[in-house]
Regions:
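Active-site-proximal, structured, solvent-exposed surfaces of multi-pass membrane proteins
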Residues: 3, 8-9, 633-859
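Membrane-embedded helix bundles of polyisoprenyl
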Residues: 22-26, 113, 117-131, 136-218, ...
Length: 859
């Protein structure tokens, strides 16, 4: 056994080094950056903190409690967990979180980054070893150039993507085997794993594979078509095998806001120089950007030289050079053409993470460069003279970049790139002068390449930054105690009044309303906006609640921290550690019967107070809940109003940004509970003062704000600072409203009388009873989803969407038992396809094995 291990280590030492060297490097970075357990920091930056970590917490709880994987009530009033799992969490490597406590989750995920990046280096090295035909140091260098390129470093926080990058080299080697040996098993399984782990990034891989196959050097037309059928067949088979994940994921993502087709109108983003400069040594990795033309392209200066060398040498056929070049040029154009980028991104906008498919270009460039390197090491010494063509080409490209770049080019990156080229050229010169033997020369340039890549990775992770877990998770223990005490079932909803992370309530697995994620339903986002909550493209937060919407959504508790200054209508319950619990003064329920008139509800008005008034009136037959309070025109500074509709909407132009560009003043003529709502996309910051004292500040637009119990004579001032950008104009719409407390009491009483009584809640199944006074609509504060099956007294009934967002059913007069069961749409069909796919691949493998045995017998 020992000898066998020694043989493996000897035969595969460089392949193993391609994994362990990045691990050592990245763990060294972790120690230097004080990543847990070496400190309190974490690699979980940007959305990894605000989205992915909370989703992992929900997943971990499900794994440990063996809860249903179909649905979760821990976000968004309830969401399709399987759809979200397929988008963010499906990698088998993520199952490691079931082995650790929640307190270790941030640490485990930080080091899972390390493992996944190292595996990307390993699979790339495996591919290059197969191309080279031997185990040598070059596979380590080029493998690390892939796994530690600026794309991987900058976007490493997208931990759910890494398996797709990891599988790409294996998929491409699988295509080689499929074409050359007519064996598609590796290709099929590698693509299956990629599709299973992240269907969205795998979609980009699939587009790339079509191009790769079309430009592959086929022997003849017949081979092109026969292998094409194999390629298509195994591709479809891998999709079928992953269908149990793909179908629910696809159907879920098609319900999001970003699912609407809207092709960009621009022709170009920028210039050649803007893009190519991102190849330069010393460029800072991009973690996120609003500008869709931004990109991560650095993958080594030796890569550029060897790619140029590939184009120059005579040992490679011209047609092969043209094929490789066409692929790279098309990908490069795709970076700069909005329409092509839109297609590459699955007909979706890029939303702050531009050019996500750049890893395909990087690997294609590295593959081309490695072919050039192989020619160099296999050829005679004089072949290396072609490197001067590569240097001249790089010089021309650098010159064009400096000439055409419209963004400020950091000259230090130009100097560093030129210096790196010079160092490599010295090595080539020493080799050409016969001072270095080939073995020493190739080892030296590969060593320098490793150093270059490692140095850029160290710099990149330092630039990325880290997050201090102590500051973000200091209240976890206290909130966990609150949850244990008060969150009795799914009907008990509670929320943080403000989160340190956008999805912090999900991190604590509270039955909450907040959801920030790519799988958020577009119709629900739109509805929450209409009701006065803060929303974004793929988010709706618990910011903007009123007593009515709190009751409607069954919000029973709010959690405050010392820094929270927002007013609340809830009553003080108790303090636990550093947090304070407030309780809704009204009884709430997960569902209510409503008058059939609710189907005429006008939910499309721009004023959320009107929307809530109409819902309360049509559903529960009460008078006007909110009375609009007239507000005076704002005072203006470095700003002018160009249009006024007389209803609180002002079109403006500003000449500068100052804290008091617009100042609205409300003087209360009586004691009342006052609310405001304003929309203003061009508002940079807002300060709200009450009698000269600041009570709220920050991003306060696009949500209802409760200003407390305002006394007669109180003065409210709303100061708005406008943005100083290219637009310098926009629209501000402000409305103030008074809550009618008598109507609210009557409304709460009627809602309690119409409440559905929950009797059982297990996983994806709910049941309860309702007593309808007449034929009515039963409204659930649960997002509408075709995956819900509702039965009344054991009989399945048709579900409908109120306002295109909420689950409702018609219920006849009398007392009834109502049960709900959720199964993700597409799961059953996907499971059937997956079983069929695995049966087919097993039959193919058995047939192949029998065929091999028959061939051996004939010999």
């Amino acid at each position: 056994m020992t000898n066998k291990i020694k043989d493996i280590l000897k035969t595969h030492k460089y392949l193993l080094l391609s994994f362990f060297l990045p691990v050592l490097l990245l763990e060294g970075i972790a120690i230097a950056e004080k990543i847990q357990p070496f400190g309190s920091e974490s690699f979980l930056i940007v959305d990894a903190l605000h989205q992915y970590l909370p989703f992992f917490a929900d997943y971990q709880e499900k794994l440990k409690s063996m809860d249903s994987m179909f649905y979760s009530f821990h976000a968004g009033l309830g969401y399709n967990f399987l759809g979200l799992w397929a988008y963010y969490l499906a990698s088998p490597l993520n199952l490691v979180i079931a082995l650790v406590s929640k307190s270790m989750l941030t640490m485990i995920l930080s080091h899972l980054y390390v493992l996944k990046i190292a595996l990307c280096c390993f699979t790339a090295a495996f591919y290059f070893r197969k191309r080279r035909g031997k185990d040598e140091i070059s596979i380590v260098a080029f493998g690390m150039a892939y796994g530690l390129c600026s794309y991987m470093v900058g976007y490493s926080w997208n931990i759910m993507w890494m398996e797709v990058m990891m599988m790409l080299p294996l998929i491409l080697y699988g295509i080689d085997k499929l074409i050359k040996e007519h064996d598609g098993r590796l290709y099929c399984f590698a693509l299956f794993i990629s599709l299973w782990c992240n269907f969205y990034m795998s979609y980009m891989t699939c587009l790339f594979l079509i191009l790769w196959y079309l430009l592959y050097p086929h022997k003849n037309v017949k081979e092109f078509f026969t292998n094409g059928f194999r390629f298509a067949g195994y591709s479809l088979l891998s999709g079928a095998m992953a269908a149990v994940v793909l179908l629910p994921a696809y159907l879920g993502i098609m319900q999001t806001s970003s699912a609407k087709l809207q092709f960009p109108k621009e022709l170009w983003y920028g210039t050649f120089g803007n893009l190519f400069s991102r190849h330069f040594l010393g460029t800072t990795p991009l973690t996120m950007a609003v500008d869709d033309s931004k990109i991560n392209l650095y993958c080594g200066i030796l890569t550029l030289l060897m790619a140029g060398f590939y184009l120059a040498v005579r040992e490679i056929r011209l047609i092969d050079k043209i094929r490789r070049l066409l692929l790279l040029v098309f990908l490069f154009f795709s970076f700069n053409m909005p329409v092509l980028g839109y297609v590459w991104h699955g007909f979706h906008d890029q939303y702050g993470i531009p050019n996500r498919f750049a890893f395909l270009y990087i690997f294609a460039l590295l593959a081309m460069a490695y072919e050039g390197y192989c020619v160099l090491v296999r050829g005679k010494r004089k072949v290396s003279l072609w490197i001067y063509f590569a240097v001249i080409l790089c010089g021309i490209l650098i010159g064009i970049t400096m000439k055409t770049s419209t963004v400020k080019l950091e000259m230090k990156t130009v100097y560093a790139t030129v210096a790196a080229i010079a160092v490599y050229m010295i090595c080539f010169a020493l080799y050409q002068k016969k001072i270095f033997r080939k073995k020493i020369f190739t080892t030296l340039i590969c060593f320098l390449f490793i150093v270059e890549t490692a140095a850029m990775a160290v710099m990149g992770f330092q630039e990325n930054g880290t997050v201090d877990t102590d500051s973000y998770f200091q209240d976890t223990k206290a909130i966990t105690e609150v949850k244990k005490e008060y969150q009795k079932n799914v009907e008990t909803r509670m929320e943080l009044i403000s989160g340190r992370m956008l999805d912090e309530s999900i991190w604590h697995t509270l039955n909450g309303m907040t959801l920030f994620g790519s799988t958020a339903q577009g119709n629900v986002v739109d509805m929450m906006d209409q009701l006065g909550f803060y929303t974004g493209v793929n988010e709706y937060l618990y910011e903007g609640a009123t007593p009515f919407t709190n009751n409607l959504m069954s919000m029973k508790y709010q959690i405050y921290r010392p820094y929270d200054t927002k007013y609340t209508e809830f009553s003080l319950k108790e303090s636990v550690g550093n947090v304070t619990v407030y309780k809704n003064p009204y009884r709430t329920a997960l569902a209510y019967t409503m008058d059939d008139l609710v189907q005429t509800w006008d939910y499309e008005d721009y004023n959320p107070f009107y929307v809530q008034n109409d819902l309360a009136t049509s559903a529960f037959d009460v008078d006007e809940l909110f009375h609009i309070v007239k507000t005076a025109k704002p005072q203006l500074n470095d700003c002018k109003i160009t249009s006024d509709n007389g209803d609180g909407e002002y079109v403006f132009e500003n000449t500068s940004a100052r804290p008091d560009n617009m100042v609205f003043t409300i003087r209360s003529t009586k004691t009342r509970r006052l609310y405001i709502h304003f929309d203003g996309s061009q508002v940079e910051n807002t300060v709200i003062e009450k009698n000269g004292e600041q009570v709220l500040t920050g991003r306060l637009d696009s949500q209802i704000i409760y200003l407390g119990n305002v006394q007669k004579g109180d003065e409210i001032r709303i100061k708005m600072q406008l943005k100083q950008d290219n637009e310098m104009s926009g629209v501000v719409r402000l409305t103030a409203a008074e809550l009618d407390e008598e109507v609210m009491e009557e409304l709460a009483q009627r809602m309690q009388e119409n409440a559905w009584k929950l009797t059982s809640a297990k996983g994806n199944h709910l049941s309860g009873t309702i007593h309808a006074q007449e034929d009515q609509m039963l409204f659930f504060s649960i997002p509408y989803d075709k995956g819900w099956t509702v039965k009344i007294d054991g009989k399945k009934v048709k579900t409908k969407a109120l306002g295109k967002a909420f689950l409702t059913v018609k219920v006849p007069e009398g007392k009834h038992k109502v049960s709900l069961t959720y199964v993700s749409s597409g799961f059953k069909e996907g499971a059937i396809l997956s079983v069929a796919g695995f049966v087919i691949i097993i039959l193919i493998m058995l047939f192949s094995q029998r065929k091999k045995k028959a061939a051996v017998k004939e010999i």
